[in-house]
Amino acid sequence: MSTPTQLSYKDAGVDIDAGNALVDNIKTAVKRTHRPEIMGNLGGFGALCELPTKYKHPVLVSGTDGVGTKLRLAIDHKKHDTVGIDLVAMCSNDLIVSGAEPLFFLDYYATGKLDVEAATSVVKGIAEGCVQSGCALIGGETAEMPGMYEGDDYDLAGFCVGVVEKADIIDGSKVVAGDSLIALASSGPHSNGFSLIRKVLEVSEADPQLNLEGKPLIDHLLEPTKIYVKSLLKLLEQTDVHAMAHITGGGFWENIPRVLPEDCKAVVKGDSWQWPTVFNWLMENGNIAEFEMYRTFNCGVGMVVALPSEKVDAALTLLNAEGENAWLIGDIAKRNGDEEQVEIL
């Protein structure tokens, strides 16, 4: 009887040394995200965070999200350095809607075979997103799972926790007819609608390198999601915001009603902005109806803010000074009966 071959974890497809190399590669990037409330270092069994002392009655706000099938395009085009920013943006932009300051972030990276270089790029992007959001990257999980993913495929999930003063929670309850709506421009499709985007690319047989306003189509599509946290935190310090809506999956039709009282509707002036070229390209090459565009994509608007009309000028001045492209997009009106809660003129 022959002696059985001695097996190792690596023989089964899990390379512990590669995982350790990844941790070494990301340490400097992670340190850039540090906040004074964070206790301990990367690598513990659990990450510790004190509550900031400035809050009298702190309320924790949590969120989790992914990047969706935007990852498919990123993997196919070997563009790994921006999807981490997308991941943080999808979570932290959801938190700021409640008025919450993001505190810390954790990520989950799963793959069949760990590509240290690609994973390093992804996590460095996550760290950059945390810097832009002002939160600490305090931990994560890298799962190498042979047999679960094909080839170079990987998946991402993010988890973010923030804090808001209890008296300052923004939940839409203060919204009234007569309030104004301010739009903050998106950087592109952000991280939603990519199954439809990929279908448009398929049926149109478009060249991803097609020049669109001076840069390749694929670069427009993979442009990282805009993070609005720091500019909106400054806005909250200076004015009374009644509601905010992060325009993600479901577009205008699904997201704005989430923050409106039942007796209010949003009246959006469709001629108050021009869609970025990439959305016009998608609409034309996919033969997509306008309603479907607004239901699927942000169409150039990544965040909508509701506030008293007399606060609009000061808010626009502040937001544009902070580097946002912000404008008056509409107002809040009284809703009658079973009217839709979003009307686009």
Swiss-Prot record:
It is an enzyme of class 6 (ligase). It catalyses: 2-formamido-N(1)-(5-O-phospho-beta-D-ribosyl)acetamidine + ATP = 5-amino-1-(5-phospho-beta-D-ribosyl)imidazole + ADP + phosphate + H(+). One of its GO terms (biological process) is 'de novo' IMP biosynthetic process. GO terms for cellular component: cytosol. Its EC number is 6.3.3.1. The keyword Nucleotide-binding applies. It is found in: Cytoplasm. One of its GO terms (molecular function) is ATP binding. Keywords: ATP-binding, Cytoplasm, Ligase, Nucleotide-binding, Purine biosynthesis. Pathway: Purine metabolism; IMP biosynthesis via de novo pathway; 5-amino-1-(5-phospho-D-ribosyl)imidazole from N(2)-formyl-N(1)-(5-phospho-D-ribosyl)glycinamide: step 2/2. Its main location: cytoplasm. Belongs to the AIR synthase family. PANTHER family: TRIFUNCTIONAL PURINE BIOSYNTHETIC PROTEIN ADENOSINE-3 (PTHR10520:SF12), TRIFUNCTIONAL PURINE BIOSYNTHETIC PROTEIN ADENOSINE-3-RELATED (PTHR10520). This is Phosphoribosylformylglycinamidine cyclo-ligase. The gene is purM.
